[in-house]
Amino acid sequence: MSGSTGERSFADIITSIRYWVIHSITIPSLFIAGWLFVSTGLAYDVFGSPRPNEYFTENRQGIPLITGRFDPLEQLDEFSRSF
């Protein structure tokens, strides 16, 4: 075996008290932050995806599928005009 890199082993890290003190706070905090990000609707605003009640409006009930192989830009323009 070659020389030691000076790093602690994984088993040594996960059995330390300091690891669990830090991670017992950060892991639940990340979970709660993610849940709030999604449940408040901020994820829809940040990523620009439609909310569940905005997929189909009264004037647009069809599914926006690209069916033509040779004219996809025309179909995309048609779909974007309906927004």
From Swiss-Prot:
It is a single-pass membrane protein. Disulfide bonds: none annotated. Its main location: plastid. Heme binds at H23. GO terms for cellular component: chloroplast thylakoid membrane; photosystem II reaction center. It comes from the Eukaryota. With its partner (PsbF) binds heme. PSII binds additional chlorophylls, carotenoids and specific lipids. InterPro entries: PSII_cyt_b559_asu, PSII_cyt_b559_asu_sf, PSII_cyt_b559_CS, PSII_cyt_b559_N, PSII_cytb559_asu_lum. It is found in: Plastid, Chloroplast thylakoid membrane. Keywords: Chloroplast, Electron transport, Heme, Iron, Membrane, Metal-binding, Photosynthesis, Photosystem II, Plastid, Thylakoid, Transmembrane, Transmembrane helix, Transport. One of its GO terms (molecular function) is electron transfer activity. The chain crosses the membrane at residues 21-35. Its cofactor is heme b. GO terms for biological process: photosynthetic electron transport chain. It holds the Pfam family Cytochrom_B559a. This b-type cytochrome is tightly associated with the reaction center of photosystem II (PSII). PSII is a light-driven water:plastoquinone oxidoreductase that uses light energy to abstract electrons from H(2)O, generating O(2) and a proton gradient subsequently used for ATP formation. It consists of a core antenna complex that captures photons, and an electron transfer chain that converts photonic excitation into a charge separation. Belongs to the PsbE/PsbF family. Heterodimer of an alpha subunit and a beta subunit. PSII is composed of 1 copy each of membrane proteins PsbA, PsbB, PsbC, PsbD, PsbE, PsbF, PsbH, PsbI, PsbJ, PsbK, PsbL, PsbM, PsbT, PsbX, PsbY, PsbZ, Psb30/Ycf12, at least 3 peripheral proteins of the oxygen-evolving complex and a large number of cofactors. It forms dimeric complexes. This is Cytochrome b559 subunit alpha.
